[in-house]
Amino acid sequence: MKITKKRLSQAVVTGLAALCLPLALQAASDDEHKYHQLFEDNCASCHGSDHGGYLAPALNAETLKGRSPTALRTIIMAGSFDTLMPPFYGKLSDDNIRGLVSHLKLTPKLDNPAWTIDDIKKSIKVYVKDESTLPAKPTFKIDDIDDIIGVAARGKYGRGEGSRAIFINSKTHQKIGEVPTGTAAHIIEYNPANPRWAYVKTDTAEIFKVDLYSMQAVRSVKTGFNGPGIGVSRDGKYILAGSFVPHNAVLLNADTLEPIKTFELEGIDPDGKQVSSDSGMIIGTPFDDIFAIALENAGQVWVIDLKEGFPVTRITNVGRHLHDAFLTHGGRKLMIASYDDSIVAAIDLKDRKIIKKLEAGCVPHVGGGSAVVVDGRTLGFGTNFGDCDKTVVSVWDLDKMEVVKQIPVDGGTESPAAHANAPYVAVDIISKDRRARTVQLIDKKSLEVVKTLDVGGHAYFPEYSADGKFLYISAGYSGDQVVVYDSFSLEKVATIPMESPAGIFSHGRVRYMTRGLSPDELAQRDGDLKGAKK
């Protein structure tokens, strides 16, 4: 009897163990899924869905090795005031914060996750089924559609009610429309062939097709997990969207947002290694029916022809860590920044080759770029993060492709703004102290800093109105407003409240291509911009 009871007890214990083991595994799996989702919902839009970094540092087992869980919890709870990261105390529970820290310290950088053409197709959402029902003209008072300025409002937490594209009449400085985007809006592109359409891309790689006449999204598509890259072709028929995660770009029908073709971004980098690459800048050009895209990690620029098969020309050994760029000479020449080489490479998009590599300060970040014509010369202005002692704005003669001057400024810089009708080039100062509140003004003729504006908050992404009369500046995530200045007197004329404003995009960009040039100058200097092919 005792033996029978003993065997029964053993059987019960064994059975319970067999039952409990999968339950324990399931609980662990459930926890892993829970904290993965917490990361996706609260962190990934800045830190990258693959835990490899994006706007903010990588968060994974390798990068967090040796970091105290207590210190990490403190950062999550309190935020980091000189960055985009807000305090999560009160938004996430203490248990969730502790679990998230543990999850981050155990999770490796993920392999390049897939987001296929079928995934893209399935992600399309249609909000207006019959676009013929949309109004034939704007439903609000505006003299010229180019007077519209769009602002990418991130929202405090990079998602939620404050995340939206906000559109403003730059003559009156009044909001005329808001389009919720769910997650942080990053960039706004306008259709060069049809002024009613805008395309808003978020940090989570969603694209919203926006009707500017009725100020509403008509459809959207998710093109990846992270990455701001987007361009619209000169005929308005195509969009090219690139991702940091996954490492690809997708060609879309600009009307329907249906995917046409994906491009896997990989190649041999300047050091001879075969690499898979993030997408850097993407740009359409008035010069030709092409797109140019930077492969950040491979150091290549690809030129995609918009004809049957969409063939690709690969321009190699451009530079290490390519990011942003701007166009000049009617869109034939591309100026692209190389972070790690501290140069800007000039590329001829007709001949598909590098013209020259120009000195560009330290960690150049040219933003949307700026170029002005002064005394018959086309001058380009290049900002740079300045992660060294050399905090300058580079000025190049874009006709001769040579450095004219490097202008000392108060810190690193991120995005220059210019206009043909305004006297100054505005540059935003990036810093971890009060300098981050400021924007400096460079006189176009003397090439000297002549004034510093104390905008407040975290001032960045200056942009002129289409007529050049007003300068718009985001006061950012600690200012929660856009501040407007008279372009000549530099007096403050308006403030426009919104949650964590970032990039500012004038509708006038489609006419002058690069900020600081005018349509008349382009036509006079470069002839007919409608075609390059003879």
Residue ranges and their predicted role:
Residues 475-534:
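Blade-level signature of beta-propeller repeat domains, shared across WD40, Kelch, NHL, RCC1
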Residues 130, 174-179, 216-221, 258-272, ...:
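A short beta-strand motif characteristic of beta-propeller blades
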Residues 25-38:
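Electrostatic cytochrome c docking/interface patches
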Residues 45, 50-54, 59-111:
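Extracytoplasmic electron-transfer domains, predominantly the class I c-type cytochrome c fold
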Residues 170-173, 211-215, 254-257, 305-309, ...:
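Short loop/turn segments that connect beta-strands within beta-propeller blades
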Residues 130-139, 184-190, 226-234, 272-282, ...:
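Repeated scaffold domains used in trafficking and secretory/extracellular systems
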Residues 145-147, 194-196, 235-237, 287-289, ...:
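Short coil/turn segments that connect the beta-strands within blades of beta-propeller domains
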Residues 222-299, 311-314:
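Asp-box/WD-like beta-propeller blade repeats and closely related beta-sheet repeat scaffolds
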